[in-house]
Amino acid sequence: MKHIDVSQLTQQFPLLQSLIALEPVSWFNPKATTLVEGVPYVGLDGSDVADASARLARFAPYLCEAFPETRASKGILESDIAAIPAMQATLNQRYGVEVTGRLLLKKDSHLPISGSIKARGGIYEVLAHAEQLAIKAGLLCEEDDYRKLFTDEFRHFFGQYSIAVGSTGNLGMSIGIMSARLGFRVTVHMSADAREWKKRKLRKHGAIVVEYAEDYGVAVEQGRKEAERDPNCFFIDDENSRTLFLGYAVAGERVKKQFDDMGIVVDADHPLFVYLPCGVGGGPGGVAFGLKLAFGDNVHCLFAEPTHSPCMLLGVHTGLHDAIAVQDLGIDNLTAADGLAVGRASGFVGRAMERLLAGFYTLSDQEMYDLLGLLARAEQIKLEPSALAGMAGPWRVAANLEWQASQGLNAAKMVRATHLVWATGGGMVPAEEMENYLASAHR
């Protein structure tokens, strides 16, 4: 990794001074372009997402057997979209800026199995790997009833193999729980930020948890090294995995169907804004890609990061991507938003998506705690701190009339806009832990 000359870089990119000072910033992306121009840089397209969607449909009968809580949705892991008008009124007052469109919450926080957005990509990649192994061994065909995977024969077969992953928490939970249920031996390398209850839950499901005193990057690197030593070990690489990315991307067509069912129109006169908390970038990157395929140029996706961990904003803004970490600027990467505590962004996601993202913003830990408390009070919905990162987004957009004008977004269009805040986790947080979160909120 070449040496970073911070003073030269801050001269070239003055916004970095605010990042270094840990000031909340908003940056609207001048590289953003149309779907047609941006998609070729991703290296994936709609057919890849359709393939992922078909694979999840094949596994749905198996998931019904393995996780009875998925039976109501026929083995399809999907979350509700809820209107949150009381929160909208509260925040219009708090921020002194009026968001005039409709405010909705995407409750990935309450997805079955692992209670976070990571149930999309993490579970999908484990299923894709299991399918590949079973087909290669002549035990499975795509036309089979996948319920046969929920048998001792298959558990014994998968028991010959292991899976490893590095995680700040939620990805590890999704991959650990899914891998163990299939019969794999699974090791989750957890960074210092990982919550204790997540480690306990993983161990209860039969996963091996290895703890590190360092951050996410170290946990991933150690997981990668362990997998290299064992030919039967598959490493799920959150920084570079196209399979994970596609698992998240399936969300786009699902949201489109939900909107159709809700009678919500998205077109040039009814824009859609989606606000996604961002850690290393795989989850929000994949979801944003799926949304762009579903809604084209009528959806504007923004990534939200903690002031202490603005890795994707830093990578895309400077064009250095994974060649720079927040620590290179003296930023500590210590945040209460454990799922977002990442110092170096995914180079794959940054390069793939930099032309398809409308903007980025940062907010403080205290702001996330305050939003957590306000949402619990206004709407009786309880989330973990990182899931609130997206909640400030509509007001960042509303405050920037210059950017709106550059996109042809006038007041009439903004009144008809839909703002979708992606709640990434928190549905499985233990009550005692949630009380601590709520106590950290300033009223």
Curated annotation (Swiss-Prot):
Gene3D superfamilies assigned: 3.40.50.1100
BP terms from Gene Ontology: D-serine catabolic process; isoleucine biosynthetic process
The reaction(s) this protein catalyses: D-serine = pyruvate + NH4(+)
Keyword line: Lyase, Pyridoxal phosphate
One Pfam family recorded for the sequence: PALP
GO MF: D-serine ammonia-lyase activity; hydro-lyase activity; pyridoxal phosphate binding
PTM annotation (N6-(pyridoxal phosphate)lysine): residues: 118
EC number in record: 4.3.1.18
HAMAP family: D_Ser_dehydrat
Protein name: Probable D-serine dehydratase
